[in-house]
Regions:
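Canonical Rossmann dinucleotide-binding motif of NAD(H)/NADP(H)-dependent dehydrogenases/reductases
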Residues: 2-34
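Substrate-binding pocket helix/loop in short-chain dehydrogenase/reductase
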Residues: 95-96, 103-108, 228
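Active-site loop immediately N-terminal to the catalytic Tyr-X3-Lys motif
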Residues: 97, 154-160, 182-183, 235, ...
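Active-site helix of classical SDR
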Residues: 119, 165, 173
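Alpha-helical segment proximal to the catalytic Tyr-Lys
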Residues: 124, 178-182
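Residue(s) in the substrate-gating loop at a strand-loop-helix junction
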Residues: 149
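A glycine/serine/threonine-rich, flexible loop-to-helix segment
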Residues: 182, 194-231
Length: 246
């Protein structure tokens, strides 16, 4: 028996890293989990490796209608939604004077607009059940967790676009918490620091991802990785499992 038996969770960007660790933890506690990733093969593999009940929605969540389709996949699979973790994201780093409009907009799209669209699409599936439960004298809580970053709370040189997107998600979180508290929806943001994922791995030719047919370089230079680790009280980055709360 898990504390999440019978619950349904959507975790975006959940085929790797923090998202996967979160999906695994939710599944271990009894939740059915919708896995999402740009890469359908990786998403299917992750779903097959998670012991609990899963479904998959593969695709670019910034595409028109994708967030609605993501939510509908969860409804078609299980008929309800209890938990949403807005985790999907990546980085395109550059100093401000060399950053293109496109690079700036893409970070806002994935880190702020996609969570907004997912939440908006899920609204009737979170609010309407709560209205009925309130009439019946029940108190059932649902959860939304938006993944931010210390880049959004403190800023980070070379990441004006990412920092802006991650700062905006904090404002969205606070606003939604005030709007949906009456429906017993707890809305929180988690601002991670240095977690060992492919976004913080060594910056080399092999560490790339494809977005919209374009290869995007991921990672940070080894010198900066070493400097960052020195600033962490533990003396090392966090792991995806620690970030997930396991």
């Amino acid at each position: 028996m898990g504390v999440l038996d019978g619950k349904v969770a959507i975790v975006t960007g959940s085929a790797r890293g923090i998202g996967r660790a979160t999906a695994e933890l939710l599944s271990e506690q009894g939740a059915s989990v919708l896995i999402n990733d740009l890469d359908g093969d990786v998403a299917e593999q992750t779903a097959s490796e998670i012991a609990g009940e899963t479904a998959v929605y593969a695709g670019d969540l910034t595409a028109d209608g994708a967030c609605d389709a993501l939510v509908q996949t969860a409804i078609d699979s299980w008929g309800k939604i209890d938990i949403i973790v807005n985790n999907a994201g990546y980085t395109i780093d550059a100093p401000i004077h060399k950053m293109s409009d496109d690079a700036f907009q893409r970070m806002l799209d994935i880190h702020t607009i996609v969570p907004f669209r997912v939440i908006r699409a899920a609204a009737p599936h979170l609010r309407e059940p709560a209205k009925k439960e309130r009439e019946e004298g029940q108190e059932v809580f649902r959860k939304i967790v938006n993944v931010s970053s210390i880049s959004g709370t403190m800023g980070n040189a070379g990441q004006a676009n990412y920092s802006a997107g991650k700062s905006a998600i904090v404002g969205l979180t606070k606003t939604l918490a005030k709007e949906w508290g009456q429906f017993k929806v707890n809305v929180n943001a988690v601002a991670f620091g240095y977690i060992e994922t492919r976004l913080t791995a060594s910056k080399d030719e092999s560490n790339v991802m494809e977005v919209g047919g374009e290869k995007v370089q991921l990672g940070i230079p080894d010198q900066l990785r070493g400097m960052a680790a020195m600033l962490i009280p533990l003396g090392r980055p966090g792991t995806p499992e620690e970030a997930a709360g396991g």
